């Protein structure tokens, strides 16, 4: 058995800064990489703080705390447990000719009251219905635009809430995701997508640290 075959599903730590562990999982057979991001945010123990982190309101927070990374987050359709979202990403790495990106995906929320957890399942709209994606792109004026899609192949975000005391709750995140970028990235940028995701949540975590 080759080294690649033996280690193809072994997580590799990419970045541990800020007590946030970003790991890469490579599949050498399909030449793909997915990521896991694990971290905890401690917040004042109020229903509003916990609700913002465990509901679709988290996207408002991510947009507000990531002006350098996110141009805009648009919620196209939303019910209590499902939303369709478009994230327009700021034009990063344009110096090497990469077009500005967007992600268009469906997010489904599942609440488990028994273990006080919430799980979000994310999937690119293109993988759900190609025509639906085209309809949304027309609505967003992204047809034939300067933006290119990042394909959100899959995402699973598990959030567990623990009441540490009367004053503080720990909100534990475990995020698995695979987002496909078609560009041929230089070696030093091969984990661009994973590090971009981490930076977004790093800024979110720092917001709550600063506010406490």
PLM region spans:
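Eukaryotic helix-grip
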Residues: 2-212
């Amino acid at each position: 058995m080759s080294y690649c075959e033996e280690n193809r599903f072994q997580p590799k730590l990419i970045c541990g800064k800020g007590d946030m562990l970003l790991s890469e999982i490579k599949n050498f057979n399909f030449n793909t990489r997915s990521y896991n991001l694990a971290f905890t945010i401690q917040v004042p123990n109020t229903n509003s703080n916990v609700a913002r982190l465990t509901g679709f309101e988290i996207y408002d927070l991510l947009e507000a705390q990531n002006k350098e990374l996110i141009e805009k987050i648009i919620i196209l359709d939303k019910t209590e447990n499902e939303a369709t979202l478009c994230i327009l990403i700021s034009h990063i790495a344009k110096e090497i000719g990469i077009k500005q990106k967007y992600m268009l995906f469906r997010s489904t929320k599942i609440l488990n009251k028994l273990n006080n957890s919430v799980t979000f399942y994310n999937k690119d709209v293109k993988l759900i219905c190609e025509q639906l994606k085209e309809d949304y792109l027309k609505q967003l004026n992204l047809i034939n635009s300067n933006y290119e899609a990042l394909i959100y192949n899959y995402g699973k975000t598990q959030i567990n809430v623990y009441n540490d005391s009367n004053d503080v709750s720990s909100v534990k995140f475990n995020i698995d995701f695979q987002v496909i970028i078609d560009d041929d990235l230089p070696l030093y940028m091969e984990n661009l997508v994973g590090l971009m995701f981490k930076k977004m949540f790093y800024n979110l975590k720092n917001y709550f640290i600063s506010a406490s």
